[in-house]
């Protein structure tokens, strides 16, 4: 399945109707969230369920240790827990029935499939709370609803074609309204065989169509996302060979037989952050000026009960700046996705097999739990001008800001999608056994180095740490170790490619000492 996003030609009437329908979808979703919260609270307070959950945990420990009887008992307890949840109404079918009652009130605007999609989204959150690492299901603001989607192309939103209308042959029909589609250039040949991407996509069967809205500083703009059956038309000609990829929170290194890549992910995201921070300071100052009664003397916000439910007031300038901030966040997100796509396209054009070490960026984004002191003493001056050596606490912050700005996990998601589309090979090694950042193929040993050490000496050559890790991944023998024979054969050529790449980067003024080492 692949998607085609097409802009819609809207007017004030259709935009007003779309806004009303998004409000109804938000109401259905949040009412379902309220219902889910109520059921989860009842489940948590139930002594019977808590007893079953405790028993299940004890049996799971025994079953994991190899106790066959405990495994059978665990399955029986799991069935009891499922039956108890079903009796409360904590199931996908029960949520669909609950949503159907609300949808009937708004059937002129929202059909049953569109309401069921919202029920499925809430149920996905409930499943995370019940079976995953989720803590609670949350309400969503009206501005957070970006799409209204159905399940098929037989009801709800239709993407249609009228061959008799030469000016606007394509349009979207939703209930009683018809919205023309702004078609892109269909004459331009953007495929290797001389075809057009849009026209080739339109030849596929349509699975369903959804309405999407994106925020610009001038307001909402609406698009039709058409989902087609089958793979997307292929714009690229995949290369041959093996490429190793070593990705970090803010950089990516890739090495194949004839290409070396060392790039910063989304390098201009800092510019967006500066603009956003500057506007947010202005918004904060304006908010404090127009709402002085809602702040304490120390600058903190008062509790809602202290200002008696009075609404917040914002100046027109403040509202305009808030709109700009929302647009900057959207542009920043689209920029990072675009840059990741460019890097992945370069990789696909060069290789057909991609080897990488899996990274848990969610864990890297979290703060450290343990409180530790630095190994190196710091000399400080006291008020009486005497000096004292102290061991300061280590910072608990890790890579949360980089992960948020650079979206490193999205790069691998795009690469996996491209591999599925072009039928390429994508493989993840065992990171606990492979340890590409520690291995030295000349001595066949593992030496752990500090994160700040970006270069190391291998076989008398100075190699960049990330590029060398990518090289070792490209020389994979099996999931736990690289092939030393292949490493010895390709290492001299790798050193030449690395030195040439670093020289070109320095000549072009590309430098990040903390990440690249230069």
Where are the predicted features?
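Generic detection of long, well-ordered alpha-helical segments
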Residues: 15, 19-22, 108, 112-120, ...
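Stable alpha-helical structural segments in soluble proteins, enriched in small hydrophobic residues
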Residues: 32, 117-125, 129, 467-477
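Short, surface-exposed linear segments at secondary-structure transitions and domain or protein termini
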Residues: 16, 186-201, 207, 250, ...
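Acidic carboxylate diad motif detector
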Residues: 56-217, 395, 400-401, 405, ...
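A generic secondary-structure signal for well-formed alpha-helical elements
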Residues: 29-36, 40, 126, 130-133, ...
């Amino acid at each position: 399945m692949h998607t085609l996003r097409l802009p819609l030609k809207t007017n004030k009437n259709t935009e007003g109707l779309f806004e009303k329908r998004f409000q109804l979808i938000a109401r259905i979703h949040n009412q379902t969230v309220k219902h889910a919260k109520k059921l989860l609270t009842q489940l948590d307070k139930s002594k019977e369920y808590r007893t079953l959950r405790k028993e299940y945990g004890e049996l799971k420990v025994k079953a994991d240790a190899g106790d066959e009887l405990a495994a059978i008992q665990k399955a029986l307890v799991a069935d009891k827990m499922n039956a108890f949840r079903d009796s409360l109404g904590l199931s996908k079918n029960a949520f669909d029935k609950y949503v159907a009652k609300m949808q009937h009130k708004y059937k002129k605007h929202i059909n049953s499939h569109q309401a069921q999609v919202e029920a499925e989204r809430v149920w996905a959150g409930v499943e995370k709370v019940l079976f995953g690492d989720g803590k609670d299901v949350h309400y969503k603001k009206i501005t957070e609803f970006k799409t209204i989607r159905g399940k098929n192309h037989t009801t709800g939103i239709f993407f249609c074609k009228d061959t008799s209308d030469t000016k606007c042959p394509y349009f979207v029909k939703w209930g009683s309204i018809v919205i023309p589609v702004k078609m892109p250039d269909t004459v331009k040949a953007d495929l290797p065989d001389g075809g057009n991407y849009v026209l080739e996509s339109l030849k596929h069967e349509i699975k369903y169509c959804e309405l999407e809205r994106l925020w610009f500083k001038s307001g909402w703009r609406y698009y039709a996302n058409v989902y087609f059956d089958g793979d997307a038309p292929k714009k690229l000609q995949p290369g041959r060979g093996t490429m190793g990829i070593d990705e970090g929170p803010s950089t990516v290194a890739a090495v194949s037989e004839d290409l070396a890549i060392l790039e910063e992910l989304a390098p201009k995201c800092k510019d967006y952050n500066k603009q956003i921070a500057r506007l947010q300071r202005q918004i904060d100052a304006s908010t404090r000026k127009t709402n002085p009664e809602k702040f304490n003397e120390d600058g903190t916000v008062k509790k809602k009960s202290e200002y008696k439910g009075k609404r917040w007031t914002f100046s027109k300038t403040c509202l305009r700046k808030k709109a700009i901030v929302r647009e900057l966040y959207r542009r920043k997100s689209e920029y990072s996705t675009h840059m990741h796509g460019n890097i992945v396209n370069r990789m696909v054009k060069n290789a057909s097999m991609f080897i990488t070490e899996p990274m848990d960026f969610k864990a890297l984004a979290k703060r450290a739990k343990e409180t530790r002191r630095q190994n190196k003493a710091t000399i400080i001056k006291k008020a009486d001008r005497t000096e004292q050596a102290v061991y300061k606490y280590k910072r608990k912050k890790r890579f949360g800001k980089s992960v948020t700005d650079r979206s490193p996990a999205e790069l691998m998601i795009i690469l996996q999608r491209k591999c599925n589309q072009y039928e390429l090979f994508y493989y993840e090694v065992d990171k606990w056994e492979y340890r590409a950042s520690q291995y030295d193929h000349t001595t066949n040993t593992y030496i752990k180095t500090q994160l700040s050490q970006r270069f190391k000496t291998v076989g008398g050559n100075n190699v960049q740490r990330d590029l060398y890790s990518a090289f070792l991944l490209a020389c994979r023998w099996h999931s736990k170790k690289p092939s030393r024979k292949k490493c010895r054969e390709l290492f001299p050529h790798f050193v030449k490619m690395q030195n040439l790449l670093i020289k070109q980067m320095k000549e072009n003024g590309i430098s990040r000492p903390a990440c690249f080492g230069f």
